[in-house]
Amino acid sequence: MRGASAFAEYWRIPELTARTKRGDWIVTGDKFFCDSHGYYHYCGRADDMLKVAGMWVSPAEVENSLLGHRDVAEAAVVGATDERGLAYSVAHVVLRGNVHGSEELAAEICEHVKTRLVSYKVPREVRFCRELPKTVTGKIQRFKLRGNARE
C-alpha cells in the first residue's frame, strides 16, 4: 500500500523499516485475491499461511468455512507437523451454547469443511476449547495455539 498517510519509519527499528518499506510502498504482509468480478477478498497474513501437501492454505479461508457450521462459535486454524515432518492444519474450535465436543462432531465439522473447500484445506485435526487465547484487543494469539498443536 502507499499514500500520503503512510508512516515514515519504525521508531528505532531500522531493520524492520528496511524489510517493510519499498520506496513509497509499504509491504503489510496482508494477502488478498481479486475475483472475476473485480472484488478483493482478504486471505490473511503472509506469516499465517500454511503449506500443506505442497499447496498454500489460508487459515482465514478455512476458519470462515468452519464458522459456517451450526455448532461453531469461533475458530482458529494453525499449522503443525507430524512425525515425518509433514505439515498439516489443526482447527481450534469454540462451540456454541451447550454443545459438547466429540469425535463424531469433529468428523461432522470436517465433512462440513470438505463440502466447501478442496481436500488439502480440510483440517486433519479438530481441537475443542472453551475459548481462544486473545490479546486485550481481541486478536487471536496464534503462537499459543501453535504451541498447543505441537503437544
Regions found by a protein language model. Give the residues of each.
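AMP-binding/adenylate-forming catalytic core of the ANL superfamily
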Residues: 3, 8-12, 16-19, 23, ...
